Curated annotation (Swiss-Prot):
Pfam families: Rsd_AlgQ. Transmembrane segments: none annotated. It comes from the Bacteria. This is Regulator of sigma D. InterPro entries: Rsd/AlgQ_sf, Sigma70_reg_Rsd, Sigma70_reg_Rsd_AlgQ. The gene is rsd. GO terms for biological process: regulation of DNA-templated transcription. It is found in: Cytoplasm.
Length: 169
């Protein structure tokens, strides 16, 4: 997921401040996920379970979900083409899948926030972490469709503006 994020950032990073903020928030979430599962990016050594890292991950998870649902998705579409855009259909198509995905992710959050993981629950917890990783991957693939579309739209608008300016001159 980090590699795919890096590739996406190289393709669309710098095209718009909203996208840059979104990608930065995703990176923070992924780093906290890697930390909570015991992987240190760019290192081979696993780290033991730490309640503080789980708390940090759950906090980043809620922040990320909230910013997407209540800030980024529709704002990006409206900023690109306006509220009456036919491209709002893209969000209408993706939104139900994101909503279902959010419910899955929030179930993890609700289950593992303020809970102590002991030897008896460790296997279940490890499976839940694997499941949440798959849910995040699915979510990022959906969001990538929005990000790619927005970046392409902004680039096309910039080219159109440049053409207009060159025709005037």
């Amino acid at each position: 997921m980090l590699n795919r994020l890096e590739s996406l950032t190289q393709r669309v990073g710098g095209s718009n401040e909203l996208i840059d903020q979104w990608l930065h928030a995703r990176k923070e979430l992924l780093v906290s996920y890697c930390t909570v599962i015991g992987i240190k990016p760019q290192k081979e050594k696993h780290t033991p379970l730490n309640a503080k890292t789980l708390e940090n991950f759950c906090h980043n998870l809620v922040d990320y979900l909230s910013s997407g649902h209540f800030h980024l998705y529709d704002r990006i579409i409206k900023e690109v083409e306006g509220a009456s855009s036919p491209k709002m259909a893209l969000t209408a198509k993706i939104h139900p899948a994101l909503k279902n995905n959010t419910q899955t992710i929030m179930a993890f959050h609700d289950c593992y926030t303020n809970i102590e993981i002991d030897d008896d629950s460790c296997t279940e917890y490890q499976q839940a972490l694997s499941d949440i990783g798959e849910a995040l991957d699915a979510r990022f693939r959906l969001e990538d469709q929005l990000i790619q579309w927005a970046a392409e739209s902004w680039q096309a608008a910039q080219l159109a503006d440049a053409d207009k300016k060159s025709q005037v001159n």
